[in-house]
């Protein structure tokens, strides 16, 4: 269970880093939002899911 928690936290940190870098780049590029909005929404959905997963796994670890 600890390994799953650590992997979920690592994935959350990695996705957060990618979103912090990627979203401003997409918004600043011409035609970027209209062509990449599905990718941004998928990344945000994955991030929200990982936040809940880390919270649930944390309740089992603590």
Swiss-Prot record:
<dbReference type="Pfam" id="PF01737">
    <property type="entry name" value="Ycf9"/>
</dbReference>
<keyword id="KW-0934">Plastid</keyword>
<keyword id="KW-0602">Photosynthesis</keyword>
<keyword id="KW-0472">Membrane</keyword>
<keyword id="KW-0793">Thylakoid</keyword>
<keyword id="KW-0604">Photosystem II</keyword>
<comment type="subunit">
    <text>PSII is composed of 1 copy each of membrane proteins PsbA, PsbB, PsbC, PsbD, PsbE, PsbF, PsbH, PsbI, PsbJ, PsbK, PsbL, PsbM, PsbT, PsbY, PsbZ, Psb30/Ycf12, at least 3 peripheral proteins of the oxygen-evolving complex and a large number of cofactors. It forms dimeric complexes.</text>
</comment>
<keyword id="KW-1133">Transmembrane helix</keyword>
<dbReference type="GO" id="GO:0015979">
    <property type="term" value="P:photosynthesis"/>
</dbReference>
<keyword id="KW-0812">Transmembrane</keyword>
<dbReference type="GO" id="GO:0009539">
    <property type="term" value="C:photosystem II reaction center"/>
</dbReference>
<keyword id="KW-0674">Reaction center</keyword>
<dbReference type="InterPro" id="IPR002644">
    <property type="entry name" value="PSII_PsbZ"/>
</dbReference>
<dbReference type="GO" id="GO:0009535">
    <property type="term" value="C:chloroplast thylakoid membrane"/>
</dbReference>
<dbReference type="InterPro" id="IPR036512">
    <property type="entry name" value="PSII_PsbZ_sf"/>
</dbReference>
<feature type="transmembrane region" description="Helical">
    <location>
        <begin position="8"/>
        <end position="28"/>
    </location>
</feature>
<dbReference type="GO" id="GO:0042549">
    <property type="term" value="P:photosystem II stabilization"/>
</dbReference>
<comment type="similarity">
    <text>Belongs to the PsbZ family.</text>
</comment>
<comment type="function">
    <text>May control the interaction of photosystem II (PSII) cores with the light-harvesting antenna, regulates electron flow through the 2 photosystem reaction centers. PSII is a light-driven water plastoquinone oxidoreductase, using light energy to abstract electrons from H(2)O, generating a proton gradient subsequently used for ATP formation.</text>
</comment>
<protein>
    <recommendedName>
        <fullName>Photosystem II reaction center protein Z</fullName>
    </recommendedName>
</protein>
<keyword id="KW-0150">Chloroplast</keyword>
<feature type="transmembrane region" description="Helical">
    <location>
        <begin position="41"/>
        <end position="61"/>
    </location>
</feature>
